Amino acid sequence: STSRGLGDVYKRQMSGKAKNVILFLGDGMSLTTVAASRIYEGQQKGGSGEENLLSWERFPATAFSKTYNTDSQTPDSAGTMTAITTGVKTHMGAIGVSAGSRTDCADSLSKGLLTWLQLADSAGLATGVVSTARLTHATPAATYAHSPERNWENDTDLTEAAKAAGCKDIAQQLLSTSRYGRGPLVALGGGRGEFTTVEERDPEYDDKVGQRLDGRSLVQEWQQAHPQGAYAVSYTHLRAHET
């Protein structure tokens, strides 16, 4: 069959050592979503749709995984992405920490889990995070951050108890991941307001300002620490920084 022939081609191409590892994750991409996509693409090609195969359905191997949190049978993206990046199931809302309580910062400080991105970074490999969501959102954040509560995206989200116990907001953690190596060399996504202060007006939308109340402009801090780096706020700006 065509799919089997393509599978043989993939196997032949997989000989040798891999150059890159890319995890492509469709957040919320359930079986029904995949089925709808398969049918829609097939109909766009002029068929009835059911006979169509999406690109990854031609791979030589596919598998299913059971998704759940330690405290919920219907999971959220924070706990499930933590399971993907660390291999450990955890409570709903948790990012990069083992199971505990969403409100207990002090307890979570001893439950941090290493992600495969951090392991790769510590081995000297180049790493990066690309997302259509905010970089501080649960799914991308689970590659680099450690927090019992997914909603602690900037300093205004943390409770006073969490601040006193020593927890850091997720945006701040993106800048402090260098303890495992260099940290992500590429971070593309939304949510720049989580990194800027309420005194800073958005560079693209004049009616918006940052969200931080601690007076820290994390963007400026990163630029000062990495003068050789590039910060882009749009596609055009990004293309201007291409090397």
Per-region residue spans from a language model:
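Single conserved hydrophobic/aromatic residue that forms the stacking wall/gate
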Residues: 1-10, 237-242
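Short, flexible coil/turn micro-motifs enriched in small/turn-prone residues
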Residues: 2, 21-23, 82
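Surface-exposed loop and adjacent secondary-structure segments within mature catalytic domains
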Residues: 33-112, 117-239
